[in-house]
């Protein structure tokens, strides 16, 4: 699978990149929302993992850009915000699942 990881925290980004790569996936990464939007609107990805709180534009805006581009690529939203309303907001914005950090 080809996976896009959009995560501003270098340690988390590298952890995900390494783990997914070792599992045999091709991984591209971005460290901010604007770069994430540029990459995420490309239909080549099978799955996207997007942090909710990113510099330049937040992860929910990245997810919205993906959906506005007409892409149905599955999106996993990562966030330290774990309240029920945070999860509901993420899913309503177009995320397919929501994972609370730390994991």
Protein language model features and the residues they cover:
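N-terminal/domain-start alpha-helical segments
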Residues: 1-103
């Amino acid at each position: 699978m080809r996976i896009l990881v959009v995560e501003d925290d270098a340690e988390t980004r590298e952890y995900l990149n390494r783990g997914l790569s070792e599992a045999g996936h091709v991984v591209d990464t971005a460290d901010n929302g604007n770069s994430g939007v540029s990459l995420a609107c490309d239909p080549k990805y099978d799955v996207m993992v997007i942090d909710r709180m990113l510099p330049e534009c937040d992860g929910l805006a990245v997810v919205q850009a993906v959906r506005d581009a007409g892409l149905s690529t599955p999106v996993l939203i990562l966030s330290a915000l774990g309240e029920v309303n945070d999860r509901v907001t993420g899913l309503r914005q177009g995320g397919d699942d929501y994972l609370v950090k730390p994991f």
